[in-house]
Amino acid sequence: MDHAAWLNEETGEAAQEAYKYFMRPDPNQREFLGPIEEEDDPLTGMRAKFRMAKVGMVRNAKDEDKKEVKVYLGFNDVTYLPHIRIPNAKPLQGWYQDKHNDKRGSRARPCFSEAILTEPYGGYCTVGCAFCYVNSGFRGYRGTGLISVPVNYGEQVRNMLSKSRTSAAGYFSSFTDPFLPIEDVYHNTQQGAEAFVELGLPIFFLSRLSYPSWAIDLLKRNPYSYAQKSLNTGNDRDWHKLSPGAISLQDHIDEIAELRRQGIYTSIQVNPVVPGIVTHDDIRHLFERLAAVGNNHVIVKFVEAGYSWAPAMIERLHKRFGPERTKAFTDLFTENQAGAQKTIAEPYRVEAHQLYRKWATELGMTYATCYEYRRGKPGTGEPAWLSMGREMITADQCHGQRVPMFTRTDLDQPFQEVKECAPTGCLHCADDNEGKPRCGSELFGAAKALRSPDFKKIVEPTPPEEDGGERKIIPITQID
């Protein structure tokens, strides 16, 4: 996949327009874009091409609200994606919501096991998916068409992990693709992942681009590490329209075959399924191609969009697939769900999941859902909305294989597996153990939305009471 060649095409995609805006040699509006300049860059040791630009931090910002930034365009006569540098990386964190989340307009966490969310690159993603929530954001650099690059990301991750006594697998990344071409310059994903692996922690990557050899090498260093790709149709032509900046579908299948040949667990996010554009037959064909190369696990999620940007997504689908197929989609895209999300009608989703789970099982793959909710049944005590996750899953955890938590007493020691971790992860650990987390921790056993201060605490079993009674569960104290 020649990423730069795609960005130079004239198909009117937003990613292409943003790229050409910053790359044009002689802009008409000098007050917004300065001339292209060159300098020796001490960070990379290369000759950098850049220009100053005024950008807004919200879409359609007023001129007086724009700020001047330095936009890097290339190095050593090689053109890269327009990007800026930022000094501070986003703090490492867990999932966004608690298991018991009753906030109005929100929804409870469906994720079985913990993960540490990373962001080696932020802002805009040039893979250009029709359904992308990242590029549809209204605030920050994602609204400018610029990628944001945290400087010395690997060192910043090392520093954050150096203060942590508890961790989970490092997730690279739920935001922009971790293997964007500028990774060849900055190595943020590689160095961030190395920081986890060197401490004995597992990692996983999620990408629509090609896995570099170093990523495969890192995955092989921990038995709990695994590879993910995001593939949402078995139709090669439609795949290119859905994710025009991605590598070809066949290239993905070939890479999955190689990952499995090297003994790496593969967990494919069939995400998001866009009915009307993607048919049941397309999903069946994708499953067959995945199973043929030994894939382990599939995670299926139907498309959803925030109320504010759903119209923009529909417009992109109309442009790429035409009115007839887009209407077939919008006829099903009718459910207003918890979390201020619009999604596919529940009866269609439930029936499809049951069918897809059957197919996956027949083909030798385990199955799970992701952020799929149904309405609670009146009179049963169920909440207004609840996750379908446990009803549909055939694996240990929603990402497939069991991946435990890790902890350590001393900060100068590698992390060690929490042996008490249940196959289901933290989400259902206490549910299956008479309401008691197996590790004894009220914090980690409650499947909360963990943040940096939480990871400074240690996980350890609470010793039994001296009188031989049941183990007492107490909050774990922070060690400074």
UniProtKB/Swiss-Prot annotation:
Catalytic activity: 5-N(alpha)-glycyl-dTMP in DNA + AH2 + S-adenosyl-L-methionine = 5-C(alpha)-glycyl-dTMP in DNA + 5'-deoxyadenosine + L-methionine + A + H(+)
Residues involved in iron-sulfur cluster binding: C125, C129, C132
UniProt key word Iron-sulfur: yes
Coiled-coil residues: none
Region Disordered, residue ranges: 457-480
Keywords carried by this UniProt record: Host-virus interaction, Inhibition of host innate immune response by virus, Iron, Iron-sulfur, Isomerase, Metal-binding, Restriction-modification system evasion by virus, Viral immunoevasion
Domain of life: Viruses
Protein's GO biological process: symbiont-mediated evasion of host restriction-modification system; symbiont-mediated suppression of host innate immune response
UniProt-listed SUPFAM superfamilies: Radical SAM enzymes
GO molecular function: iron-sulfur cluster binding; isomerase activity; metal ion binding
Role this protein plays: Isomerizes 5-N-alpha-glycinylthymidine (Nalpha-GlyT) into 5-Calpha-glycinylthymidine (Calpha-GlyT) as a step in the pathway leading to thymidine hypermodifications in the viral genome. As a final result of the pathway of hypermodification, 5-aminoethyl-2'-deoxyuridine (5-NedU) substitutes for about 30% of thymidines in the viral DNA. These modifications probably prevent degradation of viral genome by the host restriction-modification antiviral defense system.
Official protein name in the record: Radical SAM Nalpha-GlyT isomerase
Species assigned in the record: Pseudomonas phage M6
